[in-house]
Amino acid sequence: MTWIITSDQVNPPGDAAITYGITNAGGVFNLRSTGTVDYEIEWGDGNVEISTVNVLPHTYTAGNYDLVVYSDGVYRPSFNNVTADASQITSVVIGSGANLGTDLAGAWSGATNMTSFVCAFDVTSGVTNLSSTWRSTSFTDFPELDFSSAITFNRAWFGSRIENFPPNMFDTTGTLSSAAFTFSWINARLSAQSIENILVSLDTNGATGITLSINGGTNANTSTWSAAANAAWLSLDAKGWNITQNGPDPT
């Protein structure tokens, strides 16, 4: 790709990998990634950098900014519960051209002020590790993503505000480990419909002997579950799943 400088942009318009919205009180924001990277960052205040650094600092005056990350290669976000930086993130948009690699463990963990997460469906098709990826985030509607290679979702939505989760998300995955869903939705806010969607999809998957955590927080109590959710729970139980939820076990 040939990069042409036009105004504050080195890359041509439209090929952004990730756009972050942040709110900065006046001070430093560190853009965090992991692994080998080579990217351009438009800081949203007229400054542009090209970098191969995993922790790249930038100093702002107080305000709201849109940061745009461009990369032709693998670029793996990794805020990993570093509160000073993760808590500044208010939104994430990931375009269809992004290459997130295979490991998104802790990518946006601790982004407690992230109220919007938008991601192209196929961007996650090669990701295997989603441990703690959206832990403690604040957006309520989870997008439809391709989890066909994923093998672990341990703590993926732990303590998040996720309420609405799409159907069929786990129909096809990689070979799940026995702890693949341990603590995954503890202290979240899943609706009864979302729990139905999750359980039915996991039952469709066919995996056996796995621990699943959908308890705590305001996750819907079994007293509000649908017949389809109850049936899926019972089917998973018969397949050796160890499921913890709010309310008594379905019968």
What do the predicted segments below correspond to?
Residues E196, A207-T251:
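Membrane-proximal C-terminal cap and juxtamembrane stalk of leucine-rich repeat ectodomains
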Residues L67-Y70, A84-T102, T112-T128, T137-I151, ...:
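Structural signature of tandem-repeat unit edges
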Residues I22-N30, N99-T102:
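Short coil/turn motif common to extracellular beta-sandwich-like domains
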Residues N11-A25, P57-A62, N81-A84:
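Extracellular and analogous surface-interaction loops
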Residues M1-A16, G247-T251:
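Enriched but not universal
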Residues D72-N80:
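Short acidic/polar inter-strand loop motif in beta-rich domains
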Residues A107-W108, T133-W134, A156-W157, S184-W185:
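Periodic small-residue-enriched repeat registers in elongated scaffold domains
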Residues R32-G63:
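Short acidic/polar micro-motifs centered on Gly/Asp/Asn
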